[in-house]
Regions:
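ATP-binding glycine-rich loop module of kinase domains
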Residues: 36-88
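Catalytic-loop of the protein kinase fold
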Residues: 157-174
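Conserved C-lobe activation region of Hanks-type protein kinase-like domains
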Residues: 216, 221-228, 235-289
Length: 353
């Protein structure tokens, strides 16, 4: 038996009426859900996803010597933040996010710390990694449609003062033919208190934009966080089509001594080299999608969204308009247009045959 109560909910009917019917095994290379244990739960003939907060993980990250009561407080605060942020987004008419539908706390006896806060979400069909086929052109329309959904979701969050910060393939959830953003746990909200608000970046560092890797931070909260989301959206486009993130492409083209894990200079000093690596990464991406219809349009979006310097990131027309650099409306329209063009091409090709 695991000493953590969060790992031992299987078979239990919780006080809120949810019966925990299956434990979800974390994938070997997964980088998410560090602080939680995931289950499938059912209630009233409805099957949902349950996220249990794991005290042992909070204790592990807090280090030795920290009072147990303080660690419990941190865990409870993280639980309340994600729950309340979900409510905040729903009130702001956000639709492209997987929301909390129930929550509670369970106490299990015979454990050193028996309290287990949990959140219940609508059950997705899976994350986007299970759906993508990197060599199937017929899947191209679906990819554009999914990216369109995600761009809408990011814009909706921005409209209510929220930055997702952790946009990556495992956090894109598939519901039938609709894609939604998952896991707001690391998001930042301008109007809500969170431990992450003191950070420059709160997402997965494997996907972080280059300015964060080189420890450069814009002072303005909106510029810093929204620029990050723009980069992550562009990186997601790269992943959808090549199966690799933009950060991995950038790293591939940076000389060893200039990579962020070795660099000891300033962001200003590394800019010329970063720009060269970016140009090479874009070229590789463009070559990699040469077989795709509309590849030039797609590459242009990635160029703009993933530009290595945040002040020049975004659509050129938006950059010229003060305060609108990171407005995603043009990209939402573009993705919708590209999807329709791709659908039309498939229709015409079928008619020819």
């Amino acid at each position: 038996m695991d000493i953590s109560a969060a790992h031992n909910l299987l078979g239990i009917t919780l006080q809120t009426g949810w019966k925990v019917i299956r434990k979800i095994t974390k994938e070997k290379n997964s980088t998410g859900a560090f602080f939680s244990v995931c289950y499938i739960a059912s209630k009233d003939e409805r099957t949902c996803f349950l996220k249990a907060f794991d005290f042992a993980k909070f204790q592990q990250i807090s280090g030795e010597g920290k009072p147990v009561i303080d660690i419990i407080s941190e865990m409870t605060k993280a639980f309340k933040y994600e729950r309340d942020l979900s409510v905040h987004c729903q009130k702001g008419y956000v639709t492209k996010v997987a929301f909390v539908i129930d929550s509670g706390e369970e106490f299990l006896k015979d454990y050193p710390i028996g309290i287990v806060p949990y959140l219940v979400f609508e059950l997705a069909d899976g994350d986007v990694r299970s759906r993508l086929q990197f060599s199937n052109y017929l899947d191209f329309v679906w990819k554009l449609s999914s990216l369109h959904d995600i761009a809408i979701g990011i814009k909706q969050l921005h409209n209510v003062g929220v930055s997702h910060q952790d946009l990556k393939p495992s956090n894109v959830l598939i519901f039938r033919d609709e894609s939604k953003l998952g896991d707001l746990g690391r998001s930042m909200c301008k109007s809500m208190d969170s431990e992450y608000n003191s950070l420059d970046y709160s997402g997965d560092w494997n996907y972080a934009p280059p300015e964060m890797m080189y420890q450069y931070s814009e002072v303005d909260w909106y510029k810093r966080t929204f620029a990050t989301d723009c980069y992550l959206l562009g990186s997601l486009i790269v992943f959808y089509l090549l199966g690799i993130s933009m950060s991995a492409l950038l790293l591939k083209h940076m000389p060893q001594n200039l990579r962020w894990e070795h660099w000891r200079g300033t962001f200003e000093e590394v800019r010329p080299y970063l720009l060269m690596a970016y140009s090479q990464a874009i070229k590789e991406f463009h070559n990699g999608i040469s077989g795709y219809y509309l590849n030039d349009d797609i590459c242009m979006m990635v160029e703009q969204l993933c530009y290595p310097f945040p002040e020049h990131r975004g659509h050129p027309r938006n950059i010229q308009s003060k305060g609108r650099n990171y407005n995603l409306e043009r990209y939402i329209s573009k993705l919708d247009l590209l999807k329709r063009k791709a659908e039309l091409k498939i229709f015409k090709d079928c008619c020819k045959n």
